[in-house]
């Protein structure tokens, strides 16, 4: 079972919050104290909360649930893409377009356009166009790939969101709340935990911390998927008898 220890968290700097003057009072229950005007997060709270979140994510993926990783700030962007790809899930790592979940119908049309352009770029269609037209389509393709590439094969709304920074991704969280999609999120001392179903109090800026969370989540999701495959194999074996 995917778990993260106190030692792992200390080494990654999960306990370092933001400067005390930027705090959100709603995070008070998760703060241990302050050192040099920086809030220290209580890892005695974080460790069990994160491990509970991991267990739930394993459960969701064992039921073929789709997990959408969200982290659009530069520090997290590459790690988010990597983690999602590692467990065959989906991601948004550049910009959250308003309505990405709540206006899925429109997003689906944009994904169709992206896939059409991908085919055109590979089947020689671009070569038959004028230089200017080909350039415009290439730009459109790159722009769509940037914003929708991580969800183009999702095929519908996700079953859960894993968010790296609750403050930065508040629009994504609000959309998930409106649709009843559970939200798992890293919540730093400057963030509002409201709207997050599984709160993970922790540093959301240090790349080592971000990679620790994402690596553990990817492992939890993979475990869930292998449980699902094991059940499928068992069922087909029983049918074959």
Swiss-Prot record:
Q: Does the keyword Ribonucleoprotein apply?
A: yes
| Taxonomy, superkingdom | Bacteria
GO MF annotation terms: structural constituent of ribosome
Q: Does the keyword Acetylation apply?
A: no
The GO annotation for biological process reads:
translation
GO CC annotations, alphabetized: cytosolic small ribosomal subunit
- Residue pairs linked by disulfide bridges in the UniProt entry: none
* Family, per entry: Belongs to the universal ribosomal protein uS2 family.
What PANTHER family does the database record attribute to this sequence?
A: 30S RIBOSOMAL PROTEIN S2 PROKARYOTIC AND ORGANELLAR, SMALL RIBOSOMAL SUBUNIT PROTEIN US2M
The protein, known as: Small ribosomal subunit protein uS2
């Amino acid at each position: 079972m995917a778990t993260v220890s106190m030692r792992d968290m200390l080494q990654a700097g999960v306990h370092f919050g933001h400067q005390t003057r930027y705090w959100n009072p709603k995070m008070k229950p998760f703060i241990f104290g302050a050192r040099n005007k920086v809030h220290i997060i209580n890892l005695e709270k974080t460790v069990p909360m994160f491990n509970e979140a991991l267990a739930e994510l394993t459960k969701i993926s064992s039921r073929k649930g789709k997990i959408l990783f969200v982290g659009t700030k530069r520090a997290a962007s590459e790690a988010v893409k990597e983690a999602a790809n590692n467990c065959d899930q989906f991601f948004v790592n550049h910009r959250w377009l308003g309505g990405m979940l709540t206006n899925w119908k429109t997003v689906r049309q944009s994904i169709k356009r992206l896939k059409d352009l991908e085919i055109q770029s590979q089947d020689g269609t671009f070569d038959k166009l004028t230089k200017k037209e080909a350039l415009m389509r290439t730009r459109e393709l790159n722009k769509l790939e940037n914003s929708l590439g991580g969800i183009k094969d999702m095929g519908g709304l996700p079953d859960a969101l894993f968010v790296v920074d609750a403050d930065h991704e508040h629009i994504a969280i609000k959309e998930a709340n409106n649709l009843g999609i559970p939200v798992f999120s890293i919540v730093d001392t400057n963030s509002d935990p409201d709207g997050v179903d599984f709160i993970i109090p922790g540093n959301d800026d240090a790349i080592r911390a971000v990679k620790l969370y994402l690596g553990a989540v990817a492992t939890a999701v993979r475990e869930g998927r292998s449980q699902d495959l094991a059940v499928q194999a068992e069922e087909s074996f029983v049918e074959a008898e």
